[in-house]
Swiss-Prot record:
Protein name, per record: Porin-like protein L
Gene Ontology MF terms: porin activity
One Gene Ontology term from the biological process aspect of the record: monoatomic ion transport
Species, as recorded: Photobacterium profundum (strain SS9)
Main localization (coarse): membrane
Length: 341
């Protein structure tokens, strides 16, 4: 794999289950593949459970295990034109309503790109993926508007183009407003150079932004910039966001800025990663201005392409106060095992 693809794969820290999916049917024009993962996750939060604090996280081990199942289909319509469909469901180990349909879309594609409709990715996720490379933690300053993230009622385009050995990826999507009038859009571009440097930028807007208990109805606006560099077994990346009227901790934040830094080192079958995440309310002061502030480290060992184990620890730098609960300021330790198929 060349350097530009390593950068896009973020140092192999997250192997997609689609990449290991098994083809269960194929003929001269069509194919069908099934994939997914089984992932056991034990989370220990560094909080005294006996304290009478609202939304306190338990100091006992919490089971966050999950299963994902996906089905992908593709058929050739003409020599240069094809149709695709994809579905993915996630099931939680908890007896709750947390099961989620992650993807459900179909569309068409050619050498000029792919256009799909349904529940599909928005356009800013490929930028937050620059730093969202950990097995469990991270991505705390990469919160996105729903229209820029994975969402339904979504018409999405992605195109990837080779430019003399470099690669340009362009994404754009439009989310149609329903009864909640939350229509929006996002667009982004990413350029990956064969020498290991990658960078990108994007922008998104969405109507109907409001806090959980408020009556606000504002237009959220969000801009991202990202950069990465891969050299030998090392990967470095950074992300910056500037936002207006976005929801954080169920509160509508008028103006916020944030950034993330990530570094990864691959040693044989092991990958070691550290990230720093910071997000602040630009109009607040003192401790109340800090919405996210943490350092995380993890290590993952890949036994083969299908099975891995990992350990991850988050050092939460927030202090519990009137605007931050003890749970939101808690450290976390996670042990996990994952089987991809």
């Amino acid at each position: 794999m060349n350097k530009k693809l390593i950068a896009l794969a973020v140092a192999a820290a997250s192997i997609s289950s689609v990449a290991t999916a098994a083809e269960v049917y194929s003929d001269e024009t069509s194919s069908l593949a099934v994939g997914g993962r089984f992932e056991a996750r034990a989370v220990l939060a560094d909080v005294n459970k006996d304290e009478n604090v609202t939304n306190t996280a338990s100091s006992e081990v919490s089971d966050k295990s999950r299963v994902r199942i996906n089905v992908a289909g593709k058929t050739d319509i003409t020599e240069d034109f094809y149709g695709v469909g994809f579905f993915e469901k996630e099931f939680s180990s908890a007896d709750s309503d947390n099961d989620e349909t992650r993807y459900a879309y179909a569309g068409v594609g050619s050498q000029y790109g792919q256009l799909v409709y349904g529940k599909a990715d928005g356009s800013l996720g490929m930028l937050t993926d620059f730093t969202d490379i950990m097995a469990y933690h991270g991505n705390e300053a990469g919160n996105k508007l729903a229209a820029a993230d994975r969402t339904d009622n979504n018409l999405s385009y992605v195109g990837s183009f080779d430019l003399n050995g470099d690669n340009l990826t362009v994404k754009a999507n439009y989310v149609f407003g329903g009864s909640d009038e939350n229509e929006g859009y996002s667009a982004a571009a990413m350029y990956a150079m064969d020498m290991g440097l990658g960078f990108g930028a994007g922008y998104g807007e969405q109507d109907g932004q409001s806090s959980k208990n408020g009556n606000e109805d504002k237009t959220g606006k969000q801009a991202f910039g990202a950069i990465s560099y891969t050299i030998s077994d090392f990967y470095f990346s950074g992300l910056y966001q500037d936002s207006r009227n976005t929801v954080v901790n169920n509160d509508l934040i008028d103006e916020s800025t944030g950034y993330e830094f990530a570094a990864a080192y691959t040693y044989g079958k092991a990958v070691f990663i550290t990230t720093y995440n910071f997000l602040e309310d630009s109009n607040a002061s003192g401790d109340a201005s800090d919405l996210r502030d943490s350092i995380a480290i993890d290590g993952t060992y890949y036994f083969n392409k299908n099975f891995r184990t990992y350990a991850s620890y988050k050092f939460n730098l927030l202090d519990a106060n009137s605007s931050t609960t003890k749970a939101q300021a808690s450290d976390e330790f996670v042990l996990g095992a994952r089987y991809d198929f």
